[in-house]
Amino acid sequence: MYKDIATPGRTKEILERYGFSFKKSLGQNFLIDANILRKIVDVADISPDTGAIEIGPGIGALTEQLARRAKKVVAFEIDGRLLPILADTLSPYDNVRIFHQDVLKADLHAVIAEELADVSDRMVVANLPYYVTTPIIMKLLTERLPIRGMVVMLQKEVADRLAAKPGTKDYGSLTIAVQYYTEAEVIMTVPRTVFMPQPNVDSAVIRLVKRQHPPVVVDDEGVFFQVVRASFAQRRKTLFNNLTNNLPGGKENKEQIERVLVALGIDPRRRGETLDIAEFASLSNALAPLFGK
């Protein structure tokens, strides 16, 4: 059995050997506790039938744990300085393919079709860079990829937002999007002390299992997400003010918006953060004739 990468000593030795310096702009924080990585792989239920998709492999600490259990691992790394390190640390494994690419610009459907066509199970497993967590999550959710779901480590405050309940400070448009596409569960908190370099905040591992069907019936998804985003645009404002000020054409349709809210039994003075996903669905369906294409 090969020695784990995710120990303080081995990580330091690898970084010193290659003269690697962390780039703050890329949100590079490498995990140095292999037990946490094994737990992540367990939670993701990685098996010999799984094709794992990783984002930001760093020096390969999570990648090697995935490679030991999965049929194949496909990883996206934006920092070219890490490619020779990954070629070295992952040399014992012949089931890993590294793409030197920004995952936000990648055609994931094409990569999956080319690299993971022969696996029956696909899962995203990643320690996401803090600076692009939300765009990556939104891309993975909205592109309707042929995956079972994702297990990701991210900033604890973002994890709290993903799994928040209505009426709480963490509840927002990201929560609704996650709820619409997946079932979310925060698995564990990961202290900042198990990273190199140590970040200023704690992390959390969250599991998102893709839903076969959304939990609500939505007539026009474009309008649904438009209404959700508008409702949270200015958290201190009322739902009515947010909709009229932030929906395109909202001011011109002010009276109709108020009529719709009253007809649905939604007090126009409520704030967006108090509505649950079912209320947002009803509201967007009623507004779709006004704001749909």
UniProtKB/Swiss-Prot annotation:
InterPro entries given in the database record = KsgA/Erm, rRNA_Ade_diMease-like_C, rRNA_Ade_Mease_Trfase_CS, rRNA_Ade_methylase_Trfase_N, rRNA_adenine_dimethylase, SAM-dependent_MTases_sf
Q: Which gene encodes it?
A: rsmA
Binding-site residues for S-adenosyl-L-methionine, renumbered to this chain = 29, 31, 56, 77, 102, 127
Give one GO term, molecular function aspect. 16S rRNA (adenine(1518)-N(6)/adenine(1519)-N(6))-dimethyltransferase activity
Domain of life, per lineage: Bacteria
For this protein, what is the EC number?
2.1.1.182
Question: What does the record give as the organism's lineage?
Answer: Bacteria, Bacillati, Bacillota, Bacilli, Bacillales
Is RNA-binding given among the entry's keywords?
Answer: yes
Protein's recorded name = Ribosomal RNA small subunit methyltransferase A
Which reactions fall under this protein's catalytic activity? adenosine(1518)/adenosine(1519) in 16S rRNA + 4 S-adenosyl-L-methionine = N(6)-dimethyladenosine(1518)/N(6)-dimethyladenosine(1519) in 16S rRNA + 4 S-adenosyl-L-homocysteine + 4 H(+)
Q: What's this chain's function?
A: Specifically dimethylates two adjacent adenosines (A1518 and A1519) in the loop of a conserved hairpin near the 3'-end of 16S rRNA in the 30S particle. May play a critical role in biogenesis of 30S subunits.
Sorted keywords for this record are: Cytoplasm, Methyltransferase, RNA-binding, rRNA processing, S-adenosyl-L-methionine, Transferase
List the source organism: Geobacillus kaustophilus (strain HTA426)
